[in-house]
């Protein structure tokens, strides 16, 4: 029998107050229908959003091991929808319409649905206004999780409709220690992983993936070699770099195709 997996919430040990607050909210049945996670980049807001989504959709408040929890951890659950701005100037109206059209639909696998809206400060007035009513009174079983850096740079109408959750700044040293505890790797390697991946949780995933580490090594070698390269070498090595970059993406695409096949009957 495979060992039980820890829930994503349990792994948020660099944000203990956030972890405990969200855990208690889900366990007590008092989870809000709309959260606004606020904090600096690298504070773990996106990791916490996926963790909350996992706990909210799990019938055991985030056991970490059931089919639903595994799918959320792999970012392949059909009832967790992740949005990020598709334009350099912010969210497009088409994105908002797509979200609003999906909200009334029944969940595919779970009994509820979660919408994660990253960089919510880039919701412009024309796109944000369309969200307001749904954000204030969403259908039963729908949760919104918005991520932003500061309430001061967001529309007040959005902030007032969400329960704000502040995230403290996590120092590189604390982040590296968290990764070291989870992986058993030395601190120097863990500091590198956090710097490369952007957060403790993704740093742990990086250290557990031989493919990602190999791709990074090849990219670093290719970039270093460009210093002494002539024009012909630059073109040749640029092409090889593209191959290296595409390799992990091909792996992700293969995983996504398998998930689509599994969900084809829904």
Question: Can you annotate each of these PLM segments?
Answer:
Residues 1-54, 68-71, 140-142, 149-266:
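Charged, glycine-rich active-site and insertion segments that engage polyanionic ligands
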Residues 21-25, 93-114, 122, 126, ...:
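Conserved alpha-helical scaffold flanking the Walker A/P-loop in AAA+ ATPase domains
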Residues 28, 58, 105, 136-137:
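Conserved amphipathic alpha-helical interaction elements at protein-protein interfaces in regulatory
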Residues 30-31, 73-78, 108-111, 138-141:
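Short loop/turn elements that form and flank the Walker-type P-loop nucleotide-binding site
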Residues 54-64:
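Post-Walker A helix-loop "phosphate-sensing" segment adjacent to the P-loop in P-loop NTPases
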Residues 64-92, 152:
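AAA+/P-loop NTPase substrate/partner-engagement loops
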Residues 116-118, 143-148:
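Structural recognition of the conserved hydrophobic beta-strand(s) that form the central parallel beta-sheet
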Residues 119-123, 151:
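Conserved Walker B
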């Amino acid at each position: 029998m495979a060992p039980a997996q820890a829930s994503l919430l349990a792994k948020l040990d660099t944000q203990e107050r956030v972890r405990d607050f969200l855990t208690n909210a889900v366990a007590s049945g008092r989870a809000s229908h709309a959260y606004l996670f606020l904090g600096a980049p690298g504070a773990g807001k996106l990791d916490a959003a996926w963790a909350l989504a996992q706990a909210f959709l799990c019938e055991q408040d985030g056991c970490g091991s059931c089919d639903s929890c595994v799918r959320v951890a792999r970012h392949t659950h059909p009832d967790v929808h992740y949005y990020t701005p598709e334009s350099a100037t912010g969210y497009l109206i088409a994105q908002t319409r797509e979200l609003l059209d999906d909200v009334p639909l029944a969940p595919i696998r779970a009994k509820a649905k979660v919408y994660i809206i990253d960089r919510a400060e880039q919701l412009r007035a024309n796109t944000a206004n369309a969200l307001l009513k749904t954000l204030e009174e969403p259908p039963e079983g729908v949760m919104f999780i918005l991520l932003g850096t500061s309430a001061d740079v967001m529309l007040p109408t959005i902030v007032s409709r969400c329960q704000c959750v502040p995230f403290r700044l996590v120092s590189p040293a604390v982040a590296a220690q968290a990764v070291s505890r989870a992986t058993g790797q030395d601190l120097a390697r863990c500091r590198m992983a956090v710097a490369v991946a952007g957060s403790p949780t993704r740093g742990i995933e990086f250290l557990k993936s031989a493919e990602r580490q190999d791709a990074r090594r090849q990219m670093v070698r290719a970039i270093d070699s460009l210093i002494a390269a002539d024009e012909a070498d630059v073109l040749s090595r640029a092409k090889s770099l593209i191959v290296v970059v595409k390799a992990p993406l091909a792996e992700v695409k293969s995983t996504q195709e398998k998930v689509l096949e599994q969900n084809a009957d829904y």
